[in-house]
Amino acid sequence: MSLSQAKYLPQEIIRRKRDGEVLTNDEINFFIQGVANNTVSEGQIAAFAMAIFFREMTMPERIALTCAMRDSGMVIDWSHMNFDGPIVDKHSTGGVGDVTSLMLGPMVAACGGYVPMISGRGLGHTGGTLDKLEAIPGYNITPTNDVFGKVTKQAGVAIIGQTGDLAPADKRVYATRDITATVDNISLITASILSKKLAAGLESLVMDVKVGSGAFMPTYEASEELAKSIVAVANGAGTNTTAILTDMNQVLASSAGNAVEVREAVRFLTGEYRNPRLLEVTMASCAEMLVLGKLAKDTAQAREKLQAVLDNGQAADRFGKMVAGLGGPSDFVENYDKYLAKAEIIRPVYAQQSGVISAMDTRAIGMAVVGMGGGRRVATDRIDYAVGFDQFIRLGEIADSNKPLAMIHARNEEQWQQAANALQSAIKVGGDYLPTPDVYRQIRAQDV
């Protein structure tokens, strides 16, 4: 390397960021290429992440970092598929009982959109869409690119796992952040989320950023800051993006787990049962997707179209096609109960006193699912798809001897008792209940 290239030494780039200087696009590209091809060491990634953690990045730097990480591997090009509608997707920062993807993809597909969704596994207390789908026997989350494209074209939606060739630089950066206390930084979170999503070749994206006791970000202000960063950076990187801020101060669906949430998703799609909060949050995300994809002129028209495909069975039909196309049973929607794992003990847990439900520690409820084996403590853990909770009480409702906190799905008495103790301490009975909206606000490109 000649002296004239010395400014592109990784340690010089780290030094400039450490000293609060603004990095150029070329410097960021050089560093991230080095991450992808292993010429930048883990120690250098750690130092770079810590420098960003303390010095932050400007919006142009965030856009450059996101694009560099997106372009570090394969970027899917759908043009050869000749889709006759927009390619749209949604990403959630994760929560408990957040099963929206399973209904949202088929609903948008039934309205004319194409949703090639690359999803993740559970992280900490949050459930993972992939783990839920793997509760369906035969469902393949790692199909070939050909099958991914074919199912997306035929069903309008395919939900699969991240392959190693999409945003490989993010994989290395994230693994290092995870062990160096640099996870919770807006610039790094923005680039990590968007590099993976934008590598999927999307035309538009809706970002669902959670707020509250089960949210990834600790405060409303932090959630709003992340949402604004994602909208600004994604639009700056060339993908039309809107964010919505939604409530995670209680479990979103009526259930939390894997098979229990898939069961709820199918019942939602067929109209057997629709939890009102889950319906509102799903509708809000879907409506933004239809507007961004120019499939509706405004959210009011979008909601009408979405309600129609729920009512006429087209959304449920798309879900069935996706499941069958990715290796699951062809009659899954009709006979889901035959295929989903069931726990040996399904019994209610009651509050220790009567009173109004005033608060939920949603994070603790998510960790209770993990404790039962419904999530992972380490990446190699196997998941028990049968365990979890359903029929959750809602904030503002009254718990008494007739109204339990939830039904526990457990493998044995000891597990049931541990889960019961966890729920009783995570759900507050008595005191003042302050209602929160299901959807706080939308953040669109013009808002940032």
From Swiss-Prot:
Gene Ontology molecular functions: 1,4-alpha-oligoglucan phosphorylase activity; thymidine phosphorylase activity
Top-rank lineage group of the source organism: Bacteria
Pathway(s) this gene product operates in, as recorded in its UniProt entry: Pyrimidine metabolism; dTMP biosynthesis via salvage pathway; dTMP from thymine: step 1/2
One GO process term, biological-process aspect: pyrimidine nucleobase metabolic process
EC number(s) on file: 2.4.2.4
PROSITE patterns: THYMID_PHOSPHORYLASE
Keywords recorded for this protein, A-Z: Glycosyltransferase, Transferase
Family assignment from sequence similarity: Belongs to the thymidine/pyrimidine-nucleoside phosphorylase family.
Subunit field text: Homodimer.
Database matches in PANTHER family: THYMIDINE PHOSPHORYLASE (PTHR10515:SF0)
Its job: The enzymes which catalyze the reversible phosphorolysis of pyrimidine nucleosides are involved in the degradation of these compounds and in their utilization as carbon and energy sources, or in the rescue of pyrimidine bases for nucleotide synthesis.
UniProt-recorded name of the protein: Thymidine phosphorylase
The organism of origin for this protein: Vibrio cholerae serotype O1 (strain ATCC 39315 / El Tor Inaba N16961)
